[in-house]
């Protein structure tokens, strides 16, 4: 999956099993202040269980590292709570449920906690407004080219994610299918394909 970060096939971090040896090596270097543990298990997570499993492992690791003489003072807990996107029945944990789980699994350690709760709290807070610069009719396809591009909103091109697209001032007339695209010379510069909307013009 494109947004997982905590599996063996992902390029990030070090494995749980190898972490004690990495910390021991860092401590030997002398100039490094081994202050904490940072972890991130992925994005768009809508189930509390993966967090709880990961945080319990972090509690075990922190306890072990402290027993080995490392001055562990903080845990940075990554893994994003998901947004309920169209076409899914996923409901992310409520922030209160998440907070209670953090306290239950890690509260006894008495460390500083840095939380990376993901896009759930802000994912639906913003909009991208663009202007139609050209409507291109091809055989069987109509492209609405706008002045925003994949560099402004990468998620549809990168992940194939769905974002709602609506005209600011809808025109009268029957809905039809439009491909909403950006002007970049890149085939993946697409915001939505076959979107049903009323007439669109420059």
Locate predicted features:
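Short glycine/threonine-rich loop-to-helix capping motif typified by GTGT followed
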Residues: 47-53, 84-97, 123-134, 195-196
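Alpha-helix-loop-beta-strand connector modules within alpha/beta enzyme cores
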Residues: 58-60, 64, 98-109
């Amino acid at each position: 999956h494109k947004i997982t970060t905590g599996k063996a096939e992902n390029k990030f971090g070090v494995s749980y099993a190898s972490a004690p040896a990495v910390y021991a090596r860092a401590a030997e270097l002398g100039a490094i202040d081994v202050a904490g543990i940072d972890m991130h298990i992925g994005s768009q997570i809508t189930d509390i269980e993966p967090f709880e499993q990961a945080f319990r492992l972090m509690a075990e690791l922190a306890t072990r590292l402290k027993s080995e003489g490392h001055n562990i003072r903080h845990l940075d807990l990554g893994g994003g709570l998901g947004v309920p996107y169209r076409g899914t029945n996923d409901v992310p944990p409520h922030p209160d449920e998440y907070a209670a789980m953090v306290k239950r699994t890690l509260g006894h350690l008495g460390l500083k906690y840095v939380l990376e709760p993901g896009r759930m709290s802000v994912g639906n807070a913003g909009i991208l407004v663009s202007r139609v610069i050209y409507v291109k009719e091809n055989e069987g396809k109509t492209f609405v080219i706008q002045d925003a591009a994949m560099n402004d909103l990468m998620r549809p091109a990168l992940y194939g994610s769905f974002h709602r697209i609506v005209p600011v001032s809808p025109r009268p007339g029957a809905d039809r299918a439009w491909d909403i695209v950006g002007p970049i010379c890149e085939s993946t510069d697409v915001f939505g394909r076959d979107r049903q909307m009323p007439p669109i013009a420059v």
